[in-house]
Structures are given as structure tokens and as C-alpha cells.
């Protein structure tokens, strides 16, 4: 993605607004979970569409503590393990309970994101969902990649506070190099203003 064409990142208040907005809609739990998979786990549209319950569930049939994204579900060899954010995990538990009511549900085969017409949605359908949501809420310049960029930017800003490095952010993002990860990270004007007085 060229630098001038990158999707915008979301502020905390925008994330909160989208989260609340989606929950108020007809397929609120599913839609909010799709959004959280982007903004709290950094998944691409393709990865959200290809995410199966088997990548999230423990052998006991419960939602685990991480997403075990396979290479087949990802872009190239971008399979990885992503620890689950608390809010996202709670949503997945509720979504799993609803999915298990469907007589066609099978933990190894069923996809997390389904529509009324299909048991497996396409990456383009996920892209279209995000476009519709952002248009409905009035967020210009945002796309299905905005949540992923927000996740990567926030992780990069906070990773050192938990003893990690940009290499950990790279691994969470599933990037082949640090250079790719760095292109995703938004700068912070306030931080740049403050740092010159600290050094």
C-alpha cells in the first residue's frame, strides 16, 4: 500500500463509537466481533473471512486464549498465534454459543463469520462490511485495513511497556520484515514535541 493511500488509523473514541454503533444493529454481535478481530487482533479481511472455530477453540471445545491462524487462512506464510484481547474473547464466547445452536455447526469445519445466506463469507464481503459501517458512522478515509493499522500502531507504541520490542509487533502482525511493520505505524505529533525536551 503506497504511503499516501494508507487507511486511516482510529482514535480510542472512534473505536468506542464504532463498537457501540455495531452492537445496536441487527447482526450486532457478529459485526462487533468482526470489527474487534481487526482492531484488537490485527487481522486482515481475508483472515477474518477464513477464520475457523478450530483456530480459536481448545480441545475441550471452549474459546481458548489465542487465535492460532494457519498459513492457509492468511496471506502467504503469515500464519501466527495472536493472544486474545479480553473484550474480543468475551464476544467470541457469545458468538460460539450462538453458532453451536445451528445444526450444521462443526468445530473443525465451521467459520467464525457467517451470513444468513452463507456459512462462509468472502474477504470482499468483509471489506464491504467495513466500508458500509464507516460510511454509516461518518468516518471518512477508513477501510477494512484501518483496524489492522490501529492495532499495529497501538501495539508499537505500548510494546516496550510490557518488555517487548518491535519484533513482537512484527510477529503479531504476521509481517515478513520489520520494514513492512514500520510502514503501518502512524507517528505521533505530541510525542515528537515532548521527546525533544526529554533528550
Protein language model annotation of sequence segments:
Residues 1-16, 77-85:
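DNA breakage-rejoining catalytic core of tyrosine-based enzymes
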Residues 12-41:
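Basic, Lys/Arg- and aromatic-enriched nucleic-acid-binding interface segment
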Residues 26-29, 79, 119-125, 140-146:
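N-terminal core-binding DNA-recognition domain of tyrosine site-specific recombinases/integrases
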Residues 34, 46-51, 169:
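Alpha-helix N-cap/helix-start motif at helix boundaries, enriched for small hydrophobics
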Residues 36, 40, 150-175, 183:
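C-terminal catalytic core of tyrosine-transesterase DNA break-rejoin enzymes
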Residues 50-88:
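Conserved tyrosine-mediated DNA breakage-rejoining catalytic core shared by Y-recombinases
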Residues 73, 173-198:
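Catalytic-site neighborhood detector that most strongly recognizes the C-terminal catalytic loop/helix
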Residues 73-93, 108-131:
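C-terminal catalytic core of Y-nucleophile DNA break-rejoin enzymes
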Amino acid at each position: 500500500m503506497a504511503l499516501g493511500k494508507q487507511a486511516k488509523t482510529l482514535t480510542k473514541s472512534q473505536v468506542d463509537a464504532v463498537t457501540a454503533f455495531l452492537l445496536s444493529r441487527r447482526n450486532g454481535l457478529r459485526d462487533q466481533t468482526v470489527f474487534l478481530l481487526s482492531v484488537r487482533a490485527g487481522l486482515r479481511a481475508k483472515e477474518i473471512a477464513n477464520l475457523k472455530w478450530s483456530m480459536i477453540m481448545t480441545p475441550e471445545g471452549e474459546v481458548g486464549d489465542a487465535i492460532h491462524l494457519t498459513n492457509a487462512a492468511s496471506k502467504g506464510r503469515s500464519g501466527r498465534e495472536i493472544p486474545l484481547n479480553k473484550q474480543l474473547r468475551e464476544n467470541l464466547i457469545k458468538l460460539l454459543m450462538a453458532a453451536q445452536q445451528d445444526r450444521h455447526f462443526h468445530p473443525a469445519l465451521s467459520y467464525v463469520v457467517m451470513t444468513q445466506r452463507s456459512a462462509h463469507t468472502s474477504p470482499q464481503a468483509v471489506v464491504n462490511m467495513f466500508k458500509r459501517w464507516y460510511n454509516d458512522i461518518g468516518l471518512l478515509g477508513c477501510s477494512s485495513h484501518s483496524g489492522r493499522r490501529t492495532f499495529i500502531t497501538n501495539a508499537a507504541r505500548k510494546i516496550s511497556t510490557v518488555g517487548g520490542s518491535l519484533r513482537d509487533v512484527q510477529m503479531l502482525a504476521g509481517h515478513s520484515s520489520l520494514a513492512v511493520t514500520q510502514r503501518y505505524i502512524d507517528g505521533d505529533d505530541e510525542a515528537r514535541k515532548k521527546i525533544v525536551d526529554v533528550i
